[in-house]
Design a protein with these regions (language model features):
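A conserved structural/catalytic subdomain of Rossmann-like adenosyl-cofactor enzymes
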Residues: 1-370
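Residue-level recognition of alpha-helical coiled-coils
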Residues: 370, 374-377
């Protein structure tokens, strides 16, 4: 059982280890060999030690006994989702779910603690799951199970009664047969996703205008190349960057100029603009160059039918035909949201009740204007 501090920086702990930065940590509790990565980091942000406590406890779980080990830790909501894919917090969640360590996560009401009003979550972990729980996680929403205190204790204004605690235990023990209003069971992979990079082709229009030439002259200080452009390319326009560069390189060499990467980059910087109607730009190997300004990321659920390819065909290609996914960029992340699974929409009032209220207001204000101006309306 553990109740780690919320949002307390652990810089002083680094000093106790004799370490200056968290990137220098090599402790096997927090840097493990996993997923073909000998330096797989479970280290959270320096401002919140909750998941550091969790990783530490996981490293101490017994594997040689019949019952193994069981961990219950109280965390705030950030442990459910903080950290991008590949970061320490996301890696720890991934490790927990992929190693099938999480039995349940229980959401508790706000204002249960003396010094904080935020909602909290109980992480229930074990390395010896019952057969029926293997490969699955139970989420229990106990946020409505509270009774107000007669007198507040700091931020604490409510508590869970004995009957409420028994109700949570009943839900936990019932597992997949529990009341679905309060309990839901999912496959571990439900909370995992691929974060992938979606690219669109770079399209450049060339325009060797007077303004661009003047900016080039003042910024680059390459008089030889400037004179060449003024003489040979002034007012040139093209929607095919590769064709323009190819011809420019040949004519520059023919004129005795050295063609360099610096000069080619200068052409891009000062004489091109992106244009969706221009031709696609290709690199030296003939590959389509991506437009960094149009680069986007998508989260593809691990359980998405057809995987990354299926997601692209269904969710991206119909809207951006020339886009492509860089599958080498795929990083696995894990996060979850209780709101997503236990969302309860606000019950709207019946229209007849609203109309009745409006009519009542009209009646109560009848004659008000007349009394104000001293006459009848």
């Amino acid at each position: 059982l553990s109740n780690p501090p919320f949002g307390t920086p652990w810089k002083t702990d680094l000093k106790a280890w004799g370490i200056g930065k968290k990137d220098e940590i090599s402790d096997s509790r927090f840097i493990i060999n996993y997923d073909d990565n000998s330096e797989y980091s479970l280290i959270p942000d320096i401002g919140d030690p909750q998941m550091l406590f969790l990783a530490n406890n996981i490293s101490k779980m017994k594997t040689t006994t019949e019952l193994g080990s069981r961990i219950i830790e109280v965390h705030n909501g950030s442990s459910l989702f903080t950290g991008k894919p590949g970061s320490g917090p996301s890696n720890l969640r991934r490790y927990i779910f992929e190693q099938d360590l999480c039995e349940a996560i229980i959401a508790i009401s706000e204002n249960m603690f003396y010094n904080t009003g935020i909602g909290t979550y109980l992480w229930v972990l074990t390395n010896k799951k019952d057969e029926k729980r293997k490969g699955k996680v139970q989420l229990i929403d106990a946020t409505s199970m509270k009774e107000p205190l007669r007198k507040n204790l700091g931020d604490k204004n409510c508590e869970m009664t004995q009957k409420m605690r028994e109700k949570v235990m009943e839900l936990y023990l019932a597992f997949d047969k529990a009341d679905s209003e309060y309990s839901k069971v999912f496959l571990n992979e439900e909370f995992g996703f691929y974060q992938v990079e979606v690219n669109q082709p770079l399209r450049l229009r060339v325009n060797v205008s007077d303004e661009a030439l003047e900016e080039f002259k003042n910024s680059v200080k390459d008089d030889e190349f400037y004179d060449f452009l003024m003489t040979n390319e002034k007012d040139t326009e093209s929607t095919n960057f590769n064709s323009f560069i190819g011809k420019l390189e040949k004519s520059a060499k023919k004129a005795g100029l050295k063609w360099t990467k610096k000069r080619e980059n200068a052409i891009r910087k000062y004489f091109t603009t992106t244009d969706e109607n221009a031709d696609v730009v290709l690199d030296k190997k003939g590959n389509i160059e991506p437009d960094n300004n149009l680069k986007d990321t998508e989260q593809v659920p691990l359980l998405y039918d057809g995987g990354i390819t299926g997601f692209f065909e269904n969710e991206v290609k119909p809207y951006v035909e020339d886009a492509w996914i860089n599958e080498d960029s795929a990083v696995i992340g894990y996060e979850l949201s209780f709101t997503k699974y236990f969302y309860k929409p606000v019950q709207l009032r019946d229209l007849s009740d609203i109309i009745a209220d409006i009519r009542a207001i009209e009646q109560s204000t009848d004659g008000l204007l007349a009394s104000i101006i001293g006459g009848e309306v």
